[in-house]
């Protein structure tokens, strides 16, 4: 075990960025349980003098464990940070790795927890907590497994850089986080797809294999600003074709991917940073956006505003 840990640290040393250079590699290996516990501490202490940020907790646990972040290490990190000590000091000799993990996890998770408001019973209700949503709308079933890195062969041999969520044809798909629609249309691999960049520019969310003939939410266009939980499209099985609007995927599903962007040169290149989102999808499954179909189309049951990016609605 000690030898394995030493090897992990040695590998990390090779990719730790000189501060003038952007991070070029992230192995996101944090369990749902670890994220949930750290998030609970963040929410619990949000209004206390000593606020425990969940990213600080996870980054401290990660630099102590070579990025593995077991729940026991996360609990210890949270307890240690309750005192008057910085994360770097709490990590001791391993504190030199803290900055890397903090930046990496901030890019992966930075937009997930914060202040938001929902419109309920005739008024806007401010809240603090998980402000992002499962990509699958409330009331619709799905299944998935950790398939990140599984081989793919259409076009060329490559690794699967996302998580496939199997569900029913036409299942409403929503934006996990708010941002700007950066890509939209046909792709020979992903079929009908939407790409949304987070407001801070660090996260690029990719939603692919949308429904033939009716892939996108009405009126959605490139350049639009979308809210977390906003309807963006419908589940299908389009793709694997140079010709548009073709179903060559055998099973109806959503391909959901997350790319981290520390520098614009990384956005489209041979060394893009896509992370395993399986555990993240599990975390988000408890927070789903509700829609109802009316004569006017699909309508959100509880309108939403991200208060970290917009003012409190009048």
Where are these regions (language model features)?
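Zn2+-dependent peptidoglycan hydrolase active-site motif and core
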Residues: 176-219, 243-251
């Amino acid at each position: 075990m000690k030898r394995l840990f030493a090897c992990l640290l040695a590998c990390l040393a090779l990719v730790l960025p000189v501060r003038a250079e952007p991070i070029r590699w992230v192995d996101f290996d944090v369990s749902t349980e670890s994220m949930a516990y750290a998030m609970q501490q963040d929410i619990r202490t949000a209004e206390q003098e000593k606020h425990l940020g969940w990213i600080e907790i996870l980054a401290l646990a990660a630099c102590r464990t070579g990025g593995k972040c077991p729940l026991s290490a996360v609990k210890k990190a949270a307890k240690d940070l309750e005192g008057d000590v910085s994360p770097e000091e709490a990590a001791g000799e391993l504190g030199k790795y803290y900055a890397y993990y903090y930046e990496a996890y901030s890019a992966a998770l930075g937009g997930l927890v914060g202040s938001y408001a929902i419109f309920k019973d005739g008024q806007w209700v401010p809240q603090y907590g998980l402000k992002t949503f499962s990509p699958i709308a409330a009331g619709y079933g799905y299944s998935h497994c950790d398939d990140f890195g599984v081989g793919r062969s259409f076009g060329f041999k490559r690794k699967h850089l996302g998580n496939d969520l199997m569900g029913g044809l036409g299942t409403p798909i929503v934006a996990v986080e708010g941002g700007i629609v950066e890509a939209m249309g046909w792709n020979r691999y992903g079929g009908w797809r939407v790409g949304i960049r987070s407001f801070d520019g660090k996260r690029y969310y990719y939603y692919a294999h949308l429904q033939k003939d009716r892939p996108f939410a009405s009126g959605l266009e490139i350049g639009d600003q979308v809210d977390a939980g906003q309807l963006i499209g419908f589940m299908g099985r389009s793709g694997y074709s140079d010709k548009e609007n073709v179903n060559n995927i055998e099973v109806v599903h959503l391909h959901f991917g997350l790319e981290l962007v520390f520098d614009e040169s990384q956005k489209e290149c041979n060394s893009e940073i896509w992370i395993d989102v399986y555990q993240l999808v599990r975390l988000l499954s408890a927070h789903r956006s509700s829609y109802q179909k009316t004569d006017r189309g699909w309508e959100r049951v509880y309108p939403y505003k991200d208060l970290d990016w917009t003012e409190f609605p009048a």
